[in-house]
């Protein structure tokens, strides 16, 4: 499950996290495509994040629970047979874990859909969340964000034989599908892009929207281009991405709103990864198989 073309930035490494031949291996790359291999991860030793209640719990447990998506090709997906999670975001979660001093093998990945992310973080059901989670001022009122680690843009997925949709301005009268609680569908609603005569359809998973698109029950699926390209790469004879982004969607790592110490630590991990080129190794072994270049984002500390 690979994405054909997208611009991404993989978070990797951190203070105390380095590449080493003897470290923990990341998620194996999918067969085919580039031969680039994921780097090994060395688990940082004697990590301390003073003033972080979440880190104190992590350290006491010696393990992590990370919220993620399980239905996004190339980003976060779960193998139906093995139950293992794989993808760009999954590797990011593992790299942060190693930087915090926890063996990535001790992560329990928990599927959390878009509409339930804030509650899962607030309840402490997950230590942090990595899953195409767009940073916004509204969300910052409920959760904290480290990053961004990736810059996406909203786009449209349509049937390959449909030439009537060429951008956001051509959605009038169309049925557009996305995930409940997501930034993209709220933008469609706020800007009234389907009016007059159109409608909005919402589901819990993007895969459900894609099924409705293929069965011609909706006209387009909208979300970040990275996600859409993943689905298009699975069925290129029937689906295509319009290719005209109309937003900037900075992906962040969601965590407890009041835990600034942990947020700062993860920002440090991200910055070092960008500076030393480690993120590029991760990108090349995952989303880099799309053939597009990657541009690191600027970390936005607050």
Locate the predicted segments by residue:
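Sec-dependent bacterial lipoprotein signal peptides
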Residues: 1-20
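Bacterial lipoprotein signal-peptidase II cleavage site
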Residues: 19-33
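Extended ligand-binding regions for polar small-molecule ligands
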Residues: 23, 34-49, 162, 182, ...
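Extracytoplasmic small-molecule ligand-binding "clamshell" domains
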Residues: 31-128
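Bilobed "Venus flytrap"/periplasmic-binding protein-like clamshell domains
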Residues: 85-100, 133-134, 152-208, 220, ...
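Acidic, polar ligand-binding/catalytic clefts
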Residues: 105-169
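A ligand-binding cleft/hinge motif common to bilobed small-molecule-binding domains
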Residues: 116, 133-141, 189-192, 214-248
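Periplasmic-binding protein-like
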Residues: 150-158, 229, 233-268, 289-302
């Amino acid at each position: 499950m690979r994405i054909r073309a997208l611009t991404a930035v993989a978070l990797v490494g951190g203070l105390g996290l380095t590449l080493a031949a003897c470290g923990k291996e990341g998620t194996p790359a999918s067969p085919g495509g580039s031969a680039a291999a994921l780097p090994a991860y060395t688990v940082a030793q004697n990590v301390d994040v003073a003033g972080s209640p979440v880190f104190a719990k992590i350290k006491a447990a010696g393990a992590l629970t990370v919220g993620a998506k399980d239905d996004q090709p190339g980003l976060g997906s779960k193998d139906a047979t093995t139950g293992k999670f794989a993808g760009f975001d999954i590797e990011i979660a593992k790299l942060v874990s190693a930087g915090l001093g926890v063996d990535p093998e001790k992560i329990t990945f928990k599927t959390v859909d878009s509409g339930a992310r804030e509650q899962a973080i607030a309840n402490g059901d997950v230590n942090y969340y990595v899953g195409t989670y767009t940073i916004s001022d509204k969300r910052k009122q409920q959760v904290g964000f480290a990053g961004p680690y990736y810059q996406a843009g909203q786009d449209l997925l349509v049937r390959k034989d449909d030439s009537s949709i060429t951008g956001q301005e051509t959605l009038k009268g169309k049925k557009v599908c996305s995930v409940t609680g997501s930034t993209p569908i709220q933008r469609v609603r706020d800007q009234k892009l389907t009016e007059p005569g159109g409608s909005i359809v919402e589901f819990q998973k993007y895969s459900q929207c894609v099924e409705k698109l293929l069965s011609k029950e909706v006209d387009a699926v909208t979300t970040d281009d990275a996600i859409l390209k993943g689905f298009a790469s699975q069925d290129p004879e029937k689906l295509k991405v319009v290719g005209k982004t109309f937003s900037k969607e900075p992906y962040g790592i969601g965590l407890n709103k009041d835990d600034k110490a942990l947020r700062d630590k993860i920002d440090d991990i991200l910055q070092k990864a960008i500076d030393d080129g480690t993120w590029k190794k991760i990108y090349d072994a995952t989303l880099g198989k799309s053939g597009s270049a990657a541009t690191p984002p600027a970390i936005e500390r607050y």
